[in-house]
UniProtKB/Swiss-Prot annotation:
Biased composition (Acidic residues): 881-894
Location in the cell: Nucleus
Chain residue numbers at which the record places covalent cross-link Glycyl lysine isopeptide (Lys-Gly) (interchain with G-Cter in SUMO2): 75, 79, 530, 851
Organism: Homo sapiens
One Gene Ontology biological process: negative regulation of protein catabolic process
Region listing for Disordered, in residue ranges: 183-248, 307-371, 389-458, 473-585, 862-923
Keywords: Acetylation, Isopeptide bond, Metal-binding, Nucleus, Phosphoprotein, Repeat, Ubl conjugation, Zinc, Zinc-finger
Name of this protein: PHD finger protein 20-like protein 1
Function recorded in the entry: Is a negative regulator of proteasomal degradation of a set of methylated proteins, including DNMT1 and SOX2. Involved in the maintainance of embryonic stem cells pluripotency, through the regulation of SOX2 levels.
This protein's record includes keyword Nucleus: yes
Origin superkingdom: Eukaryota
Chain positions with N6-acetyllysine modification: 909
Length: 1017
């Protein structure tokens, strides 16, 4: 049954159509459709500039396909009028050159994939996309071509002069043709609604314009009083602009527009006004481009016209008036000396850079809370400034782009992002040096292109009273000082949507977020005191370590369940088992004891020991996978479909740490496949990170290797494959080898030779596991005894500096004896601060004993707490730490417990309340009634008594633990009964034979190693 291709904007499902496809290396390439299988619903995609052997069948609804020019769904139907032009071969157009300017050209051919082969009038032939071609006005067609057929229109070099010689009339004609096209295409555009304004956002993210200071009004001799108004903007537009009307005008013939422009009803009579205003600016470009001074900042080429329009003359009054009347009055009010001053610099202005194309039409009124009284200027001041700059400056200034506040690609600038993120203060620039005509004072205003279309119930800034905007307005433009208008007013924070405020509040505790660094989260958390902020910061950061490990574990489990692989790979599935280590069942257990399993492995590739600390808070039920690349999503609307589609090359940091797991589950589902693909790591001995041929995956680190490099064939893959790095990690100590042999320790299964039918370790796995547990228990008791020896040494020395750690008794109370929940919370917060710092600063946090919470050893807060029995068994099963961590772990734990003890003691004394034990959560009461009258000698004696009591309790625990070890030995000895040997053989009698066997085994293993070395070459 034939299927119908889906409707995907920007993708044409036909043979030969071009699109972008994602290859197996997770890179996007321009591609072409070779074949279409309508039965299966997939296409054969050919990656351009690659061999056809890389052609791949991809389903047409796959997320591995995207259009070359990514269209925004919400911009459909808001296209400019130029999109409706149908160009034909041989038609004269304006085509964009590499300097982003439009030059006259002729269409040579129209290609099938939607591109145009154009020939510029200097003979250069290029293939351009539709978006880089504009229609040439009818009155401009043919008139320049008749003067200079091929040599007149050459691209402009950076010096501002033409590469070839050409006359001034030709340059003027070029300027006229380019500017007229822009005027025709842009003046009839739709009113600047919030959705329509997003189109120009990629071109001009921030406009800078300069206004001469008020002081210059007194120095002018001729003042032309004008009555201007603020232009009536549509109600959906959320910017109030400072439009320019008093623009000096150069006399150019105005081209007549032949195309009908779609206008809205409220702007039906403003076409002629905008037309006149654009022509004035177009005339000024030739003289203005020479530059007011070298330090005058410019945007890109297509941003100069709005900058000039807004910099020339603002509106000092706000009376309601028709826009056509304003433009007509502006034409009649030009001073007489304008023509003379501009004509003096006419010869030089003809060779300067000229902003053409759509630059003259990108009129974007800034969102700036300025009162009209602050920006009144006189026309004569501007005229003198322009004329002096034209005469004194011959070479144009180099355009300086102001820094962008965001470092993402321009496709990622969405209205939701700008609506929810206030602009950072460092994006406001000051003009470094003024023009020669002014007195050193310019007024720099940054227009705020934040379109808040997605924010409901946000009032226009234009409708805000001046009292609210008052704190943001500079009231004094004093001599020698530069005043910069702030980017956002105080009221703009109140206008933000509730979602933005919520996310800012959630992100405040995160020390890694940029919201704290930029000060964006301050308004959202104004009610939080400084101490509460600190506690939140440490609470959040403390759980980051444990949550990351849990996410690693869940990500691997999720990937193990993924059966779909586009390449031919061997993917093993790890069987993770939960650890059950309850010694209370030993009275009834014999063989059941031997079936204990170890903890699941939570180590990812190259990571250290996973956090099993009881200090870390409980993580919630579902986590989100970490990604290799992270994107700053602070305050963003993650439900934006366009943004998620555009984030194919960067993966989202879907972290519960930043968002408190506030996401919708649909976003997690969509990014799951992409996250899987990005987390596929190829780490082979050949050091090539490309997938090629048959790939095998390591069971431990989940990295992929080439089977050829590993010397393994598809039919000879072992049941349990572990890569060379996991088998022998670099820098690993031999004494810590047992930490890495996890499967051997957990399952008791060793790797055997393939020609043996029976593997000894497989037959005796339970015995081996129980033996390992016995050794771990003995090792743990040894460490506890070592700690007891140190404590006895402290007990013997009355003046030992660590004796004060036992100032509080080891008397334990139950949880129900806590005085009040509030006191418990304060004490817990005090403990958490120290604990979180410890978890952050050390790779190996205090370990969680297994099923032994009721014993005193595990709940002690004693001096130099050793690794207990359960802890060592955990350390045997956990491969992530090395001996370097173990050597310093005792000292680190000692310091940590000293800090936590002191903080507990002092906080409890301040509040007069019970402390929280850092290890167990039991309550220990500290009585301070005799604190002031206590004798130092009596206090030392009390400390020694407390320590002695503690040592006795630990000794009792050691005794009970030795009883458990004895039961383990009995269980192991009972295995001899199953073999039929009632009496175990004498080990000393078999010692010589055992030595010979071990020696022979070493010789054989040496030979096997030599064979493996020779075969791997």
């Amino acid at each position: 049954m034939s299927k119908k291709p889906p409707n995907r904007p920007g993708i044409t499902f036909e043979i030969g159509a071009r699109l972008e496809a994602l290859d197996y290396l997770q890179k996007w390439y321009p591609s072409r459709i070779e074949k279409i299988d309508y039965e299966e619903g997939k296409m054969l995609v050919h990656f351009e500039r690659w061999s056809h052997r890389y052609d791949e069948w991809i389903y047409w609804d796959s997320n591995r396909l995207r259009p070359l020019e990514r269209p925004a769904l919400r911009k459909e139907g808001l296209k400019d009028e130029e999109d409706f032009f149908d160009f034909k071969a041989g038609e004269e157009v304006l085509a964009r050159w590499t300097d982003c300017r439009y030059y006259p050209a002729k269409i040579e051919a129209i290609n099938k994939e939607g591109t145009f082969t154009v020939q510029f009038y200097d003979g250069v032939i290029r293939c351009l996309k539709r978006m880089h071609i504009k229609a040439m006005p009818e009155d401009a067609k043919g008139q320049v071509k008749s003067q200079h057929p091929l040599s007149w229109c050459c691209p402009i070099d950076p010096a501002g002069s033409c590469n070839q010689s050409m006359g001034s009339e030709d340059w003027i004609a070029l300027v006229k043709a380019a500017a007229a096209a822009a005027a025709k295409n842009k003046t009839g555009s739709k009113p600047r609604t919030s959705a329509n304004s997003n189109k120009d956002k990629d071109k001009d993210e921030r406009k800078w314009f300069k206004v001469p200071s008020k002081k210059e009004e007194t120095s002018t001799c001729i003042a032309t009083p004008d009555v201007e108004k603020k232009e009536d903007l549509p109600t959906s537009s959320e910017t109030f602009g400072l439009h320019v009307e008093n623009v000096p005008k150069m006399v150019f013939p105005q081209p007549e527009s032949t195309l009908s422009n779609k206008r809205k009803n409220n702007q039906g009579n403003s076409f002629q006004a905008k037309r006149a205003r654009l022509n004035k600016i177009t005339g000024l470009l030739a003289s203005k481009a020479v530059g007011v001074d070298g330090a005058e900042k410019k945007e890109d080429y297509n941003e100069t016209a709005p900058m000039l329009e807004q910099a020339i003359s603002p509106k000092p009054q706000s009376q309601k008036k028709n826009e056509a009347d304003i433009s007509s009055s502006a034409n009649t009010q030009k001073p007489a000396l304008l023509s003379s001053t501009l004509s003096s610099g006419k010869a030089r202005s003809k060779k300067c850079k000229h902003e053409s194309g759509d630059s003259s039409g990108c009129i974007k009124p800034p969102k700036s809370p300025l009162s009209p009284e602050l920006i009144q200027v006189e026309d004569l001041t501007l005229v003198s400034q322009l004329s002096s700059s034209v005469i004194n400056k011959t070479s144009p200034p180099q355009p300086v782009n102001p820094p962008r506040p965001f470092k993402h690609s321009e496709r990622r600038r969405r209205s939701q992002r700008l609506a929810t993120l206030p602009m950072p203060d460092d994006s406001v620039e000051k003009v470094s040096s003024p023009s020669p005509a002014t007195d050193g004072k310019v007024f720099s205003i940054s227009s705020q292109n934040q379109q808040e279309s997605s924010v409901p119930e946000v009032p226009d800034v234009a409708h805000l009273p001046l009292e609210k905007l008052g704190p943001c307005l500079p009231l004094d433009l004093s001599r020698g000082s530069e005043v910069t208008a702030p980017v956002a007013s105080d009221s703009s924070y109140r206008n933000e949507c509730p979602r933005a405020e919520k996310e800012d509040t959630q992100m405040l505790p995160n020390p890694s977020s940029k919201a704290i660094a930029d000060g964006r989260g301050a308004p959202a958390a104004a009610g939080i005191s400084k101490t509460e902020k600190k506690v939140k910061l440490e609470d959040k950061s403390s759980t980051a370590f444990g949550k990351r490990k849990e996410k690693d574990k869940e990500r691997r489990e999720k990937r193990d369940k993924d059966h779909y692989r586009p390449k031919q790979k061997k993917k093993k599935k790890k069987k993770k088992k939960s650890k059950q280590h309850d010694y209370s069942d030993y009275e009834d257990s014999s063989l059941e004891f031997l079936e204990r399993c170890s903890s699941p492995l939570t180590r990812s590739s190259g990571s250290s020991l996973a956090s099993r600390s009881m200090f870390t808070e409980k993580t919630t039920t579902y986590q989100y996978p970490r990604a290799i690349l992270s994107v700053d999503l602070s305050g963003e609307n993650l439900s934006d479909v366009d943004f998620l589609d555009d984030s194919s090359t960067e993966s989202l940091l879907l972290s519960g740490d930043e968002y408190n797991q506030d996401f919708d589950s649909t976003n997690f589902e969509e990014s799951q496949d992409e996250d899987d693909a990005l987390n596929e790591i190829v780490r082979c001995i050949c050091e090539m990170d490309e997938e090629n041929g048959f790939m095998i995956q390591c069971e431990e680190c989940l990295c992929w290797q080439h089977s050829v490099c590993m010397g393994l064939l598809e039919e000879s893959i072992p049941e349990q494959y572990i890569c060379y790095i996991c088998r022998d990690p670099p820098g690993q100590r031999w004494s810590a080898k047992y930490r890495y042999d996890k499967e051997w320790l957990n399952n008791g299964r060793m790797c055997g030779l393939s020609f043996f039918k029976e593997n000894y370790s497989h037959l005796n796995a339970k015995k081996i596991v129980s033996t390992h547990h016995l050794l771990a228990d003995v090792y743990g008791v040894t460490e506890v005894l070592h700690g007891l020896q140190l404590k006895i040494g402290i007990l013997k020395n009355k003046h030992h500096p660590d004796l004060h750690l036992w100032a509080c008794s080891g008397k334990r109370k139950d949880q129900d004896q806590i005085i009040a929940g509030v006191e418990k919370k304060i004490a817990q917060d005090t403990v958490n601060r120290e604990e979180k710092k410890y978890v952050q600063n050390h790779k190996e946090p205090p370990r969680l004993p297994l099923k032994m919470e009721g014993t005193y050893i595990t709940s002690e807060h004693s001096y130099q707490k050793p690794q207990s029995f359960g802890q060592d068994c955990k350390s045997l099963a956990d491969p992530g730490s090395s001996d370097d961590d173990d050597v310093s772990s005792l000292e680190e734990e000692q310091e940590f417990h000293m800090r936590s003890k002191n903080s507990l003691q002092y906080s409890a004394k301040e509040h007069g309340m019970p402390e929280k034990n850092p290890a167990e959560g039991n309550t220990v009461f500290v009585y301070n009634d005799k604190k002031g009258t206590e004798d130092p000698g009596d206090s030392h004696l009390q400390w020694q008594l407390n320590l002695l009591t503690h040592i006795e309790n630990v000794q009792n625990e050691v005794t009970s633990r030795m009883d458990l070890i004895e039961k383990e030995v009995d269980v192991l000895e009972s295995w001899l009964d199953f073999t039929g040997e009632l009496e175990p053989p004498d080990p000393l009698a078999r010692l010589p034979q055992l030595k010979r066997h071990i020696k022979q085994l070493l010789i054989d293993m040496g030979k096997v190693q030599q064979i493996a070395t020779l075969c791997s070459v």
